[in-house]
Amino acid sequence: MAEFINQIPGYEKGRVQRITATDEVSESFIVAQMASDLRKKWNTSVLCISLDGHKEAIESLIPQEKAVGTVYVLDQNNPEFKVVLRKATGIINRRFVRALIISGAERLTAKYFQNHPEKGREWIASHLEGLSRGMGIPVILVRVHEDQSEV
């Protein structure tokens, strides 16, 4: 699993990366590993937003070693994209966060774009690309593989 984490492209500033996990446990592990890795590599803080209620799991998997940055984990159980984006932008601006990881990304389109998932994915992608390029940070979307929904 650690080799997989190191091979993930997406640690580039100003880029949105999508990653698919096999199950919810590996999703939490991937998020925690990437957050820890980014914190160590860049000596900066990382914001993780859990859209599927895995805040405690992610926090418990993040190594507690001394590092310059902090990993903030936000639990957003009712994911309306505009609310998630607004909260993320506020935290990024106030806390000097230089990477954003969103877990449970398949839920972003579920609420408002059920009838038009492709339109929802395009809308979300354009807003995340704007956030990523505008602030110069990587945005990483981690989702559990499900055939019927895709972000």
Regions found by a protein language model. Give the residues of each.
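The Walker A/P-loop phosphate-binding site
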Residues: 1-66
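Generic hydrophobic alpha-helical segments
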Residues: 4-7, 35, 81-89, 128
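Structural motif
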Residues: 18, 99-103, 140
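Short, conserved clusters of charged catalytic residues that mark active-site
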Residues: 30, 83, 123
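Substrate-gripping "pore-loop 1 plus following alpha2 helix"
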Residues: 114-127, 151
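Phosphate-binding/switch region of NTP-binding enzymes
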Residues: 129-151
